[in-house]
Design a protein with these regions (language model features):
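Alpha-helical segments flanking ligand/cofactor-binding loops in enzyme cores
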Residues: 14, 18, 38, 62, ...
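Short, surface-exposed connector motifs at secondary-structure boundaries
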Residues: 18-24, 41-47, 65-72, 122-129
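Alpha/beta enzyme core
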Residues: 34-46, 55-67, 85-99
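Conserved, mostly hydrophobic/aromatic
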Residues: 40, 74, 100, 149, ...
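Conserved SET/PR domain catalytic loop and adjacent active-site segment
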Residues: 189-258
Length: 258
């Protein structure tokens, strides 16, 4: 959220964490110094966030990784070696619970600089989960990131975009945020599992009424040799499918076919 001081007291953090849990939300926070890491670790935070500007601070990342908690590393401004060094630092102390976020460190960021393909490339290159830290306006780039496999999305939230501060103008207000979440869930559901096993149960009626099956164009008497011009394909698709036509042509009718 916006407008909260980075010097928020330990008491405030505990209250905020408790409130999040009452809403079935996960309390997360970035940590930019050793003291903050230790405070958040004591709070038993679910994961620690490494901001983009701290990705080259390997001492800070090492201290985070040594907590054993999952780390979310934002990769704005980074090149491949920056990312590799950060990952190696975590793995060297036994922490492999990592998520890399593709990020463009502009506020706001124009969509054409979002480089969402990096979500897939980083996942394949480093063998870790990947997501997207979004600074664009609107929700369309976030939706696209899900289709590319983002499993974590960071989006700025504010109570009022007119508040003073660098992040408020491109952040989402609660109503917009809720709408984005509903659409994200739709996109997740729409991705499916990639299998193609024929019509789903919900499609059965369309399948039967829309597909065609083979029918006799004329009466075919018993004993007649079936020829191409005797057969047509018509709806509904409850009989012999058209792809079997070549197997039928040239056969002898074993009974009268109307």
């Amino acid at each position: 959220t916006q407008g909260v001081s980075s010097a928020a007291s330990d008491v405030y953090k505990r209250q905020l964490k408790k409130y999040c849990e009452s809403l079935n939300l996960i309390f997360l926070s970035s940590a930019c110094d050793i003291e903050a890491i230790d405070e958040l670790d004591e709070l038993e935070i679910a994961a620690l966030k490494v901001p983009s500007c701290e990705l080259s601070d390997l001492g800070l990342i090492r201290h985070m990784a040594q907590t054993g908690r999952p780390l979310i590393l934002s990769t704005g401004l980074a090149d491949w070696m920056d990312i590799q060094r950060a990952i190696d630092t975590c793995r060297d102390v036994g922490n492999r619970n990592l998520v890399l976020l593709q990020c463009t460190s502009l506020y706001p960021a124009p969509p054409h600089l979002s480089n969402l393909e990096a979500i897939k490339v980083m996942r394949d290159a480093f063998g870790v989960l990947t997501g997207y830290s979004d600074h664009t306006e609107g929700n369309h780039v976030c939706l696209a990131s899900v289709a590319l496999g983002a499993c974590v999305i960071e989006k700025h939230l504010t109570l009022d975009r007119k508040l003073v501060g660098p992040d408020h103008p491109f952040s989402m207000e609660p109503t917009q945020f809720k709408e984005m979440m509903l659409r994200l869930r739709d996109v997740e559901a729409a991705l499916g599992d990639g299998t193609k096993t024929g019509p789903r149960s919900e499609e059965r009626e369309v399948f039967e009424q829309g597909r065609r099956s083979l029918h006799a164009k004329i009466r075919i008497p018993k004993g007649a040799v079936i020829k191409r011009e005797m057969i047509t394909a018509k709806r509904p698709g409850l009989g012999i499918p058209p792809y079997l036509l070549d197997l039928i042509i040239g056969r002898v009718a074993r009974s009268d076919i109307e």
